[in-house]
Amino acid sequence: MKKALAVILSTLASVAAMTTTHAETFSFDRDAAGVLPAGWRAGVTGRGSPKWSVEQDASAPSKPNVLRQSGSGTFPWCVRPDVSLADGYVEVRFKPLTGREDQAGGVVWRWKDGDDYYVARANALENNVSLYYTAGGRRNTIKYVDAPVPGNVWHALRVEFAGKRIRVILDGKQYIEMDDDHISGPGAVGVWTKADSVTSFDDFRYGIRAR
């Protein structure tokens, strides 16, 4: 009986170890204002002069700081290059502030470099959610879905990915669920904007598997 119990406990411990979720959250509140947060890398797919910096924001979900993109470029991005994630989730709070051409906020995953990655974004000017893959510096549309995205309001964007399966969730509602295999294997994670979007981000989080 004791031997059987020991086997059961050992099995349960092994299962728990295999399903343990590693998660990390970045609220930018310990980073200096006016500069890029420590451990992050910024750039642009295409052309332009993006400007990513930590800024104080009284409306931040976790006060006092946010990460803000206030420059412009084809597709500005800001990633954690030390992360290597193949399957899991990434989520962020974002607030589209201004932009004549676009008012977008998004997340990237399986980021290999500035020209190759997945991106999901929401756009306050278009009121939609979309999923893309970027390969060789060219953004390719996978799917668009209409969704309410009011400007100057904080939203929650989450993507879950495992193998080919991708789920995109905005403000607690799933808008996209589908299979796509254009980009596989581990990569970095981060945030993304488009064109002249001025967008704030807070509470960026990723984990090794979807919850």
Feature-to-residue mapping (PLM):
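Short tryptophan-centered beta-strand motifs in secreted/extracellular beta-sheet-rich domains
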Residues: 28, 90-92, 153-168
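Ligand-recognition surfaces built from glycine- and aromatic
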Residues: 183-211
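Short, aromatic/His-centered strand-loop micro-motif at the edge of beta-sheets
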Residues: 135-156
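Bacterial N-terminal signal peptides that target proteins for export
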Residues: 1-11
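Extracellular glycan-recognition surfaces and repeat-rich motifs
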Residues: 33-66, 73-74
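Boundary at the C-terminal end of the N-terminal hydrophobic targeting segment
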Residues: 17-23
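Short, solvent-exposed beta-strand-to-loop segments that form ligand-recognition rims
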Residues: 169-190
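Secretory/extracellular carbohydrate-interaction modules
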Residues: 33, 69-135
